[in-house]
Amino acid sequence: MRAFFTGYCTAFIRQDAPAIAKHFADMVHVTSDDERDVSVQIASAAEWRKIIDRLLDMYRAIDVGSVEAIGLATDALSPRLVQARLRWALTDKASRQLYEFDAMYTLARHTEKFRIIAIAHNELPEYRKCLARIKTEQRSPQ
């Protein structure tokens, strides 16, 4: 699992949407907590690719330079089904911490490779706080 998430993380650092998308199954169940509500959606590969593109746009808006998994725990439910919990840390291109968030993944191996079939995360509130902080800093005189 560590190698899988290292490749996943590297794809995010490179902002390589096709490489990120290759880590996901053809259908993905996504659950997001945005502090106001919990949204649940099922996305096809094409829909998920559009979401990845929007996420990368969000990362560019806050100048993400690095994404690091600072915590990883896994539970193998079977040889073909694994759950993973990760703590992610994002820094900007000047190596300043932006924010951290948690995500839980369910991965399935239908062939020789695992693919993410479900993800639950709490990233959106952390992103919004970070974006607001950056906008405030940009408006404040130095």
Residue ranges and their predicted role:
Residues M1-D16, H23:
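Short, aromatic-enriched amphipathic alpha-helices that serve as compact interaction elements
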Residues Y8, I20-A21, W48, A84, ...:
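Hydrophobic pocket/interface hotspot
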Residues P18-L72, R80:
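A solvent-exposed, acidic/Ser-Thr-rich amphipathic alpha-helical stretch
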Residues M27-H29, R85-T91:
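Generic short beta-strand segments
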Residues A69-T74, R87-L90, D102-A108:
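Hydrophobic/aromatic beta-strand elements that line small-molecule binding cavities or substrate pockets
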Residues L98-E137:
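Short beta-strand edge/turn micro-motifs at domain boundaries
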